[in-house]
């Protein structure tokens, strides 16, 4: 698992993220992919040291799944509306919010008396990221080009739907 985590991060490095500065949509997805590597490294650490088994779960679910799922959903909605994903201003900030939520959640495991404040900060960043994702999905849904049916494709009068 340690080798797999290192290979994921090495592969990400070979994609040259610094060359994609003009593509925030791709940078956001790369950030989510980086959380997969971090999660694998934390899993290897948990097998050797047993500090907090939940750290791996949080890296995968909050960091990787949050950034990748929101990024892919938004890219699909933008492309369906015939927009340009690289022009969407919130794709990278959303990935950064999910990353902030993951980092705060991981820090809460070792924070001592400040664990609750970090946990609330993580929950706030995570909720804000999903709220902004929903808002942008609605925005792009409204802009989706609706294909009109050709009058020849409309059902004829007297047509009844099959079923009960």
Regions from the PLM with identified roles:
Residues 1-164:
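Hydrophobic alpha-helical transmembrane segments of multi-pass integral membrane proteins
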């Amino acid at each position: 698992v340690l080798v797999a985590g290192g290979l994921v991060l090495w592969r990400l490095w070979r994609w040259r993220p610094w060359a994609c500065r003009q593509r925030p949509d791709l940078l956001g997805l790369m950030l989510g992919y980086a959380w997969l590597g971090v999660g694998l490294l934390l899993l290897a650490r948990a097998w050797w040291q047993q500090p907090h088994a939940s750290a791996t779960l949080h890296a995968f679910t909050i960091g990787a799944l949050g950034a990748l799922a929101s990024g892919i959903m938004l890219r699909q909605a933008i492309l369906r509306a015939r927009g340009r994903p690289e022009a969407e201003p919130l794709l990278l900030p959303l990935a950064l919010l999910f990353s902030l939520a993951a980092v705060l959640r991981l820090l809460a495991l070792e924070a001592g008396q400040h664990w609750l404040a970090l946990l609330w900060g993580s929950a706030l960043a995570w909720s804000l990221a999903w709220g902004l994702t929903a808002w942008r999905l609605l925005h792009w849904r409204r802009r989706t080009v609706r294909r009109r049916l050709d009058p020849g494709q409309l059902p004829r009068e007297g047509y009844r739907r099959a079923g009960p």
